[in-house]
Amino acid sequence: MIMSKETLIKSIREIPDFPIPGILFYDVTTLFKDPWCLQELSNIMFEMYKDKGITKVVGIESRGFIMGPILATRLNAGFIPIRKPGKLPAEVIEESYDKEYGTDTVQIHKDALDENDVVLLHDDLLATGGTMKAACELVKKLKPKKVYVNLSLIHISEPTRRS
């Protein structure tokens, strides 16, 4: 069974007013629970990056931890987490950013990447771009050879708000 990108997107549940009033939340668990959707999403992303020489997939907490390791395995690459403060045990670097409903900080291990790495920075979707921008800044500080940015599902140019 081959699914279109539109079919994958339609399988995502929208939840109004979560986590705060005025935010339309895209719940990707409805896509991930369907084995055919999960496989098709994996296939689409693998085809995009299979010839790029990716050595590390960097996933952003927490939903980047779902497809990130799947994609890393398919690309024969390592997986590196970007996490919220206090979750990584070794020395870290961090970056703070604004998001739709507040301010947050993300961290990565200081020794996670080096100048020989070709990185695929992965998250599930883009809302304001704050998290991805902070993650890009973290990855750039570690000076990898090249960085690709991948979003599994949806690009939202502005925060989606209900009237």
Regions found by a protein language model. Name each.
Residues I2-I54:
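Active-site-facing substrate-recognition patch
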Residues I54-E61:
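Short glycine-rich phosphate-binding loop at a beta-alpha junction
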Residues T55, D117, V147:
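Conserved acidic residues
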Residues I66-L75, C136:
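Short Gly/Thr/Asp-enriched flexible loops that form oxyanion-binding sites at enzyme active sites
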Residues A77-V119:
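Short, glycine/charge-rich flexible loops or terminal/linker lids adjacent to PRPP-binding catalytic cores
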Residues D124, G129:
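Conserved G/P- and acidic residue-centered "switch" motifs that form tight phosphate/ATP-binding loops
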Residues M132-L153:
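A short alpha/beta connector and helix-capping loop motif
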Residues V149, I154-S163:
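Single conserved hydrophobic/aromatic residue that forms the stacking wall/gate
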